[in-house]
A protein has these predicted regions:
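Active-site metal-binding loops of divalent metal-dependent hydrolases
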Residues: 1, 37, 100-102, 132-134, ...
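Pre-active-site segment of Zn-dependent metallo-hydrolases
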Residues: 1-37, 46-52, 105-111, 137-148
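Cap/insert and terminal regions of metallo-dependent hydrolase folds
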Residues: 15, 19, 23, 31, ...
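Redox-cofactor binding/interface segments in oxidoreductases and associated redox assembly factors
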Residues: 34, 96, 155
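Glycine/Thr-rich phosphate-binding loops of Rossmann-like dinucleotide-binding domains
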Residues: 42, 105, 163
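Conserved S-adenosyl-L-methionine
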Residues: 52-58
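Metallo-beta-lactamase
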Residues: 55, 63-126
């Protein structure tokens, strides 16, 4: 839970508030889904701290297509890479990578070189949709139809300015 969403610690967007909970206070985590590779969604130090805390039972991490390579050289294992519409089973869950309207980049030279994804986590008793960052698109209608609706959804609110830049992806 670094202070900046940036490749460097001294520049870039700074956190406005402290996280609501520390890594040490987190309960045991079984799985993590990563929506895309922007620095505010994929933080190396945070993931490393979670793994260190749970080294006996590390969480399984689900990432969009071509994102697994980023984990090479880190002491983080159990990474599962998925393309849109792929499904993996994890314990009683079905994990689905699904399309959303966004993009990926960690530098000026790698725009859209890895995929971004929303996630549907299906349990025998309920369905959860995690959008990550996304603009409004027909994907919402298509996902609702394909999965017969959701019991719970985490959909982003905010990141609207400047509108000319953000309207397609937030």
């Amino acid at each position: 839970m670094t202070q900046r969403a940036s490749p460097v610690s001294f520049a870039g967007p700074k956190r406005f508030m402290k996280p609501g909970i520390s890594i040490e206070e987190l309960p045991h985590i079984d799985l993590i889904v990563i929506s895309h590779n922007h620095y505010d969604h994929l933080d190396r130090l945070t993931l490393e701290k979670i793994y260190q805390k749970q080294e006996d039972q590390p969480p399984k991490i689900f990432v969009p297509l071509r994102q697994k390579k980023w984990f090479e050289g880190l002491d983080i294992t159990n990474v599962v890479e998925m393309d849109w519409w792929e499904e993996q089973e994890f314990e009683v869950w079905k994990i689905h990578a699904v399309p959303v309207q966004h993009w990926s980049s960690r530098s000026l030279w790698d725009r859209n070189q890895v995929l971004w994804a929303g996630w549907v986590l299906e349990h025998p008793k309920f369905r959860f949709f995690f959008a990550g960052d996304t603009g409004y698109s027909k994907d919402f209608i298509n996902l609702g139809k394909k999965f017969d609706g959701f019991d719970l959804a985490a959909i982003p609110i905010g990141a609207y300015e400047p509108r000319w830049f953000m309207k397609q992806s937030h």
